[in-house]
Each structure stands twice: as C-alpha cells, then as structure tokens.
C-alpha cells in the first residue's frame, strides 16, 4: 500500500468513524488508517506485550517538538495512544548513526553529508535516550551495511516472535513537513503537510489470498529457517538496534570528532586537499 505525502491542508473529522477510515490519506494519518484497518480492527485492543517498540530510521530530522513526536508515535504504534503510558525510551527507538559509524564508513566523515543532522534538532532532551546505532556488533550478517553511510528511511514494529507487525520504507524523514501535523485553526482541525514524499507500507494481512493462507514478514538475519508463508524483509542494520553506549557521540555534520577517519578528516566539511603535504 502506498503512503504519500502531498502539500496541503486536509480536513480532520470532528467525530472520526469507529475505524478512523475517514482520516486523510496522507502522511502519518495514512499509516494510522492502515494499522487500524488491517492489524487492529475497530474496537479491538491488542495486547501491548505482544509488540516491540516502534523503530524509526531516517537520514534527517526536523525541528520536532515532544508534543508532535508523541502524536506521531501513537499514530504509528499498534498500541495507539496506550503506547504513551510507558516511557518514550520503552516505546520507540531512533536509528541514527554515531560519529564512529560515519567516521569508519567507506567514505569517512564526508559521507555524512547524506545524513544532515543539525545539533539543534538532535540534542533535544526527550530524544537523547532514544538514539540507537546504525552499526551492530551482534551479527555478521552480510546484508548489514554498517560500512556504508545510510540514506534509506524505514519504520516498523515487531511482534513478540520477531516477525514484523508492519513495515514501511520510503522517502519520509522524521519531520513535520514530511509526515504532517494536526493544526487547530480558524476552520477547525486540519492536517497540514508541506512536502512531497512516498512510501510503501507492508503488513502480513495485505498478502492474504483466496486460500486464506497465513503469512509472516520476517527480517533476514542469516540464521532464520524459512517456514511456509514467510516473506523476508532485508534490513541493512540489525532489527533490534542497540542503544548508544556511554561514550558514543551522535553524528552531526556540524561537529568535529577527535578520532580521524581513514582519510585524516575530523568533520564532514574538512577539505582533503588541505591535509596533503
């Protein structure tokens, strides 16, 4: 299923239908509709213990507020607003490279230009405990691309058996222009979107067929044995991302790092020619 974003103001119903299918078909509202339609049908309350945290991986982050972020994650979580009953750290993981991830990549710090993070957007107190590494020390899976600078954007939530409840890959970065925001204006509640984006939403229920076979979407980890009905989803990072360690520094293209990359640079804007004799 396609998840588009298109600039505009979209009306929000004063009293949404029981299954919320009268919400706008753009941004995070489209994902919310899909989850409610296919994964948690109307008036059913899923057991929150059966689902892992929401994982968000992106290559840029906007100037988001904690209020917007909570609205965003409650829309994308299978648990809905009940996800906010727990701490944010338990509810969501943000995959964002460390300085070491970028510095040790094949391009070094200059490659971090494709992950343009501004410190004013990254160093917000409510976000800091949520960051997880791009690289992984827990697996030697050949599809992991820890030596390559990420530009992909992925969002998903796992079931308790490590299969995907749903998965989205697209162009949406973590920002209000890309995903949209609710606005209470002179014409009532509207949903404002400022950017053109496109994503693909997948869940096992979308693979149903006339034989009513059951399907699972599972990550490729190099060890999993295929079962009938398994649909493999390749991820270039570990599907259980690791939180930053005590000494990990988050990546920002505005920062200089003490450890040089393989080219002798210390930052994304270092000029290689200036390092030559």
Where are these regions (language model features)?
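PLD/PLD-like phosphodiesterase catalytic module centered on the HKD motif
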Residues: 1-277
